[in-house]
Amino acid sequence: MPKRTDIKSILILGAGPIVIGQACEFDYSGAQACKALREEGYRVILVNSNPATIMTDPEMADATYIEPIHWEVVRKIIEKERPDAVLPTMGGQTALNCALELERQGVLEEFGVTMIGATADAIDKAEDRRRFDIAMKKIGLDTARSGIAHTMEEALAVAADVGFPCIIRPSFTMGGTGGGIAYNREEFEEICERGLDLSPTNELLIDESLIGWKEYEMEVVRDKNDNCIIVCSIENFDAMGIHTGDSITVAPAQTLTDKEYQIMRNASMAVLREIGVETGGSNVQFAVNPKNGRLIVIEMNPRVSRSSALASKATGFPIAKVAAKLAVGYTLDELMNDITGGRTPASFEPSIDYVVTKIPRFNFEKFAGANDRLTTQMKSVGEVMAIGRTQQESLQKALRGLEVGATGFDPKVSLDDPEALTKIRRELKDAGADRIWYIADAFRAGLSVDGVFNLTNIDRWFLVQIEELVRLEEKVTEVGITGLNADFLRQLKRKGFADARLAKLAGVREGEIRKLRDQYDLHPVYKRVDTCAAEFATDTAYMYSTYEDECEANPSVDRDKIMVLGGGPNRIGQGIEFDYCCVHASLALREDGYETIMVNCNPETVSTDYDTSDRLYFEPVTLEDVLEIVRIEKPKGVIVQYGGQTPLKLARALEAAGVPVIGTSPDAIDRAEDRERFQHAVDRLKLKQPANATVTAIEQAVEKAKEIGYPLVVRPSYVLGGRAMEIVYDEADLRRYFQTAVSVSNDAPVLLDRFLDDAVEVDVDAICDGEMVLIGGIMEHIEQAGVHSGDSACSLPAYTLSQEIQDVMRQQVQKLAFELQVRGLMNVQFAVKDNEVYLIEVNPRAARTVPFVSKATGVPLAKVAARVMAGKSLTEQGVTQEIIPPYYSVKEVVLPFNKFPGVDPLLGPEMRSTGEVMGVGRTFAEAFAKAQLGSNSTMKKQGRALLSVREGDKERVVDLAAKLLKQGFELDATHGTAIVLGEAGINPRLVNKVHEGRPHIQDRIKNGEYTYIINTTAGRRAIEDSRVIRRSALQYKVHYDTTLNGGFATTMALNADATEKVTSVQEMHAQIKKS
């Protein structure tokens, strides 16, 4: 059946901001869907509130709306654009929930819009736990014993039937949000209370515990003629009880017999038929009891998912693209496989002759007090994938690609420690983020495979692989570098050992191992991912390294090549924004006739799509792996400034090895990052900085602090995302910081800066080509200095700064760009206090604000800068004017505190946001209101507000209180704040702090008395005391601000209607051209 002709235009729903459980894999699927549908001649309308995505680039769709994914806003878009169909399967849970809401509210019917890709009934049948259970029974498949509850009474009744331990999951949430495992009644009640609150339908599913069972996933694609193919089988290395997003996973499944695999394959196809997924991809999850082989279906997702992104990258089969085409009526046999150049149809099941391992990346160090044990609720923030010819090779490559300081199975405990065994046993039984390394330690400490299995329930086959690697490591330590003959070294490299790991074991430097390999002429070869296990030829250059005989890389010799180094796994502080820049570099240079080479190991991203670049190397971004690729490709230039800290920290070593790093030189990057060298540059330019000092010892710090004056910002040098950065208010605080946090920097000094309280922070993105400086955009932060720039909302153009102040900044940026000899992108941060401009820092690289600025101004900064790096000046490109748009754009961040119940949700100098949204409006207020709606804020227009502010905010709080009263709010205040308001003639109701007797603040929040809370604090003691206010506000879904500026912005936004007007990016950019 060829494509449908009754449909002319299609609305694609995006996934919105990146949160834990829903990351950039949906940018990858959405971007593929846009391409696939436009190829077929459809008009594509896209809505997604996240500006840091490739899919929201103006070229990707015919009309792009960076608007909140909220049914009322989408209704406006449908009314304006009149699409014939809506495709909800590309934007994760957000898009499915929005589509169901549009259906429920009658919007689809009102405007005659058809849902394609999945029906509302199929989505509901897969997501509604009771309907799903009935459907599975109908086709003879087993599901876990379970019950459904809508209240605590019902929940306790189910628990009596299912027994403890049991697993609790709220309906219609993603990444296991709000779920957990309860071992007793107390834990059960706590999880249920939270889960009922978080489920949009107030529904919980309570299951018998399957902890310790083996977990598998099948990625299935089905078309409307009932052709079904399995794209990939995935096995979870970690047993049931750990969310699949937090498990190490392997493809293809390794420990199934052929018979078991066929049973599972047939079952997964039966599931799709019964649920009614007629077109597109789904993932079906199974659990197998290793004791008796009982197979049960856990769940299915009737959409493109995190696993399908992994399956696409693991096999080269573009699930999202195929799903989009099936949704408009094609069948699998009509679609051709790109990778084999159309030699095979898409109805051929991919077969693979390699092993793929995915390992999740965690960021618990950002969340003091978080429970860091892995459960059924997802907590990882990113993932890394590696490809090898054996399980061992692929696992070790993934470990070093993870960038957590490990080059392989580095030990976690010292075996001399008398507590070592106790610690190992505890870590194996109750898994945290590092369990894989503790397994290796267990073998070093003498545990047997059975002993480890009994603690972990990880299949013995995987454990034997790790045990063998540990034994090989012991042998390397024993024979040393002289014992590494050509055969032994080759054997080690085939098992995935990194040079750096072997060097550590042999007690030499990494360079020595590389020298030895050169002597033996021992280098990796590159194999291609071709979907067909080399049965057909492929022209697609999608490669991975391995130590075998035949190399399939076949690099071109006559073309100018540029290599872009990606950012590796997502983590807080280095996310999709950097991937966005890498993709733009590749696209721009391809347009200019260069052959582009991408090196990255993150399976969720657009950069690792096989058609983003001419050649893709799916490899860890480490010195060894990059040098080997450079050796065979011989690029004319390598770009390290776009992937965040990952490639940046390789810059000097690459340069030393003779690699042509283009753009800003590694030395210039060092001049900006090294405090002392930077100081010289600033002094020479006579720019103002906050008083500061660099110290290497605690007593020296105490002395310097007295000179500078408190409060201070303290941090180690060279960090991204503000790791181990804190504001200290007195000497006791400073001493505590040195004792607990400073081990972060290996002999690197610690920086002390005077903290500018109440200053306005400003971010400026710019491009320099050596002759001129282009200002990309000046962003004024809404939260004051002291809140990490990555966690602060910001406005472009600035909404309070005077023209003069902005001009001073423009001049300073220009001076700095020339002084540091920047070629390409740079980002400068300023603080403005009492009309004085202070320079905070300069980053001569792509910053996380680049995508936002590009969307707001219509200038693709990352593309322009990539061309500058390749030698094309700004004048030649015709991009010389700073664009100041005739409307406001506001970026707001999304924070993951709901996943970490123990953590204080106070904003500070340590970055913790996972994603961002953008709001656009004619006024600042309208733009801010849209950004709030897009970030799922629960702000109400009226009600009762609670004010509790620190000493320094007391004079300004009167103005805020007056604004809230005018808006119709009733006011409550804590003692100190109430006195100040009373003196100004405003009389709030007085409320007790928690230690002042009941009813206190927490009681009132629990009773739902407040619709808005503003709570600002200073000093460790006050922060500890008021933490309960912030946690309760979060728990009971009350909108709260922890800065006064945030409060003023919120009250401004109350008068704007975020759902009234929708504007496409294309219309915005046309307005700029007019003005």
Curated annotation (Swiss-Prot):
Enzyme class: ligase
UniProt binding sites for Mg(2+) 3: Q829, E841
Region (Carboxyphosphate synthetic domain): 2-403
MGS-like domain sequence ranges: 937-1075
Keywords for the protein's UniProt record, in alphabetical order: Amino-acid biosynthesis, Arginine biosynthesis, ATP-binding, Ligase, Magnesium, Manganese, Metal-binding, Nucleotide-binding, Pyrimidine biosynthesis, Repeat
Ligand binding (Mn(2+) 2): E299, N301
UniProt family annotation: Belongs to the CarB family.
This enzyme's EC code(s): 6.3.4.16, 6.3.5.5
Region of interest called Allosteric domain, as start-end residue ranges on this chain: 937-1075
Annotated stretches, region: Oligomerization domain: 404-553
Binding site for Mn(2+) 4: E841, N843
Protein name (database record): Carbamoyl phosphate synthase large chain
Residue ranges the record marks as coiled coil: none
Amino acids binding ATP 1: R129, R169, G175, G176, E208, L210, E215, G241, I242, H243, Q285, E299
Every ATP-grasp domain range: 133-328, 679-870
Pathway noted in the entry: Amino-acid biosynthesis; L-arginine biosynthesis; carbamoyl phosphate from bicarbonate: step 1/1; Pyrimidine metabolism; UMP biosynthesis via de novo pathway; (S)-dihydroorotate from bicarbonate: step 1/3
GO CC terms in record: cytoplasm
Region (Carbamoyl phosphate synthetic domain): 554-936
Binding site for Mg(2+) 1: Q285, E299
Residues that coordinate or bind ATP 2: R715, R754, L756, E761, G786, V787, H788, S789, Q829, E841
InterPro entries assigned: ATP-grasp (IPR011761), CarbamoylP_synth_lsu (IPR006275), CarbamoylP_synth_lsu_oligo (IPR005480), CarbamoylP_synth_lsu_oligo_sf (IPR036897), CbamoylP_synth_lsu-like_ATP-bd (IPR005479), CbamoylP_synth_lsu_CPSase_dom (IPR005483), MGS-like_dom (IPR011607), MGS-like_dom_sf (IPR036914)
Job description of the protein: Large subunit of the glutamine-dependent carbamoyl phosphate synthetase (CPSase). CPSase catalyzes the formation of carbamoyl phosphate from the ammonia moiety of glutamine, carbonate, and phosphate donated by ATP, constituting the first step of 2 biosynthetic pathways, one leading to arginine and/or urea and the other to pyrimidine nucleotides.
Binding residues annotated for Mn(2+) 3, in chain numbering: Q829, E841
Binding residue positions for Mg(2+) 2: E299, N301
Naturally occurring in which organism (per UniProt): Salmonella typhi
Cofactor(s) the record lists: Mg(2+); Mn(2+)
